[in-house]
């Protein structure tokens, strides 16, 4: 009976913080706190418990591919020949100086 009680107590104990597989990084890419990262993972930062935040390479690359749309180019202010002629006609002082 005593052995059963000891086993029951050990089974119901919560693991410590370092034994838990904690999630880390941000909302877009989830990583796991580990001492050594797996082959398909990259250590990106340190977790609170001193372990590495291991991120999956495929998820990280997929997140980098999602980019913001490019900014619209500003309108160019190039004058056409007709615009230039209109400007000259509106300024009579320029006409008199050029003749």
Curated annotation (Swiss-Prot):
Listed InterPro entries: Beta-defensin (IPR050544), Beta_defensin_dom (IPR025933)
Keyword field: Antibiotic, Antimicrobial, Cleavage on pair of basic residues, Defensin, Disulfide bond, Secreted, Signal
Segments forming a coiled coil: none
Propeptide part(s) removed at maturation, as residue ranges: 66-99
Record-annotated disulphide pairs: 24-53, 33-47, 37-54
Position of the signal peptide: 1-20
Keyword Signal recorded: yes
Compartments reported by the entry: Secreted
GO cellular component terms attached to this protein's record: extracellular region
Gene Ontology BP term (one): antimicrobial humoral immune response mediated by antimicrobial peptide
Location (main, coarse): secreted
UniProt function note: Has antibacterial activity.
Family of this protein: Belongs to the beta-defensin family.
Name listed for the protein in its UniProt record: Beta-defensin 127
